[in-house]
Structures are given as C-alpha cells and as structure tokens.
Amino acid sequence: MRTGSITRKTEETDIAVSVNLDGTGTYKVDTGIGFLDHMIEQFSRHSLIDIECRVKGDLHVDQHHTTEDSAIALGQAISQALGDKKGITRYGHTYSPMDEALCRVALDISGRPVLVWKAAFTQPRLGEMDTELFEHWFQSISQAAGITLHIESLYGSNNHHIIEGIYKGFARAMRAAIAIDPRKADAVPSTKGILGG
C-alpha cells in the first residue's frame, strides 16, 4: 500500500492528513469550510485515493490559510505516498462534463510544479467559499505534490458545475497518473532515471 501522512501546525492552522493511493475512494474530511469539504470528497471518490483530512484553521480571519494549508498538506501526503515514483503511469488527462459545463485537466507527476489555470467564475462565492481561492488551492497542491497541472474550463454557466467538474477531472487524471504500469513496475518513468529537477 502506498500511504502518506502529514501533520502540520502553524499559528494559522492545525492539520492532519493521511492518504492511501491504493484505496477505494473513502474519505473523512473536515476543514471547517463546507464547500471545500465537498470538493475534497469529490476528489477522493473519483481518484479512488482514500483521504482523511482534519483542519482547524483561523476561519475567524478568513478562509485563505485553511484553503492553502489543506492543499499543501494533501499534496505533501500524496508526494510521500508516491515515494520514488517507480512504476507510475506519470501522466493523466481527462475531459470532465458536469451538466452544461465541460473542463479539461492534464497533469504530469514530474516533480516540476506548474499550474496553468484557465477558469473564471461569475460569482464571488460558492456556499461560504470565496471562488478566488480555488485557483490558489490548485496552485498549492501542485507545488506540494510536484505536479505540472493544466486546468481549463472550456464552457459552462453554472459556477458550481464548473468547479465540481474541475475537481472531478483532477481526480480522474490523478487516478490515471498514479496507477502502476505492470510493464515498468520497477522503473521510474523518465529517461533521466529520476523525476524532478
């Protein structure tokens, strides 16, 4: 089993995250932000990564620190679980429809974190969550997990459908990328022999 566990405590947040990359998509998520919980649960369910994520953050200030730090800890746990990355497929991509909305996600577990974000929202909030924080969440998980990540909202009119399609697309792309290729189970998927740098 490929598992990772991270605890992270600062003056702003207190976080415990654990993941099992070879799971079935079970989750226990409590960030204190209901909409963010819903999105992380979608990521777990559709990636088949088991996730436990508990965050106590300074929500009396705003949601920024909780959103950012949850993504950092989750990315670190995924990176830890991937280890030397031997045998992984490495790349994943998907088109993800959610009713009238369609998004495209492509990623490379390269060790070189990059986020290209092409998505916009017509509302400042979804539930109690600021929509500007979604890009920051993906930026943070990309950095912490070492993922090159391209996200595009191709079209859609419902803000909830757009972001849920993005999270589900990210999940399905990750599911493909972390899968073990039995033909190369003992090899790092790079001609350099390492991923990163």
UniProtKB/Swiss-Prot annotation:
Its main location: cytoplasm. The keyword Transcription regulation does not apply. Signal peptide: none annotated. It is found in: Cytoplasm. Keywords: Amino-acid biosynthesis, Cytoplasm, Histidine biosynthesis, Lyase. The keyword Amino-acid biosynthesis applies. Pfam families: IGPD (PF00475). One of its GO terms (cellular component) is cytoplasm. CDD domains: IGPD. Pathway: Amino-acid biosynthesis; L-histidine biosynthesis; L-histidine from 5-phospho-alpha-D-ribose 1-diphosphate: step 6/9. PROSITE patterns: IGP_DEHYDRATASE_1, IGP_DEHYDRATASE_2. GO terms for biological process: L-histidine biosynthetic process. One of its GO terms (molecular function) is imidazoleglycerol-phosphate dehydratase activity. Its EC number is 4.2.1.19. It catalyses: D-erythro-1-(imidazol-4-yl)glycerol 3-phosphate = 3-(imidazol-4-yl)-2-oxopropyl phosphate + H2O. Belongs to the imidazoleglycerol-phosphate dehydratase family. PANTHER family: IMIDAZOLEGLYCEROL-PHOSPHATE DEHYDRATASE, IMIDAZOLEGLYCEROL-PHOSPHATE DEHYDRATASE HIS7. This is Imidazoleglycerol-phosphate dehydratase. It comes from Novosphingobium aromaticivorans (strain ATCC 700278 / DSM 12444 / CCUG 56034 / CIP 105152 / NBRC 16084 / F199).
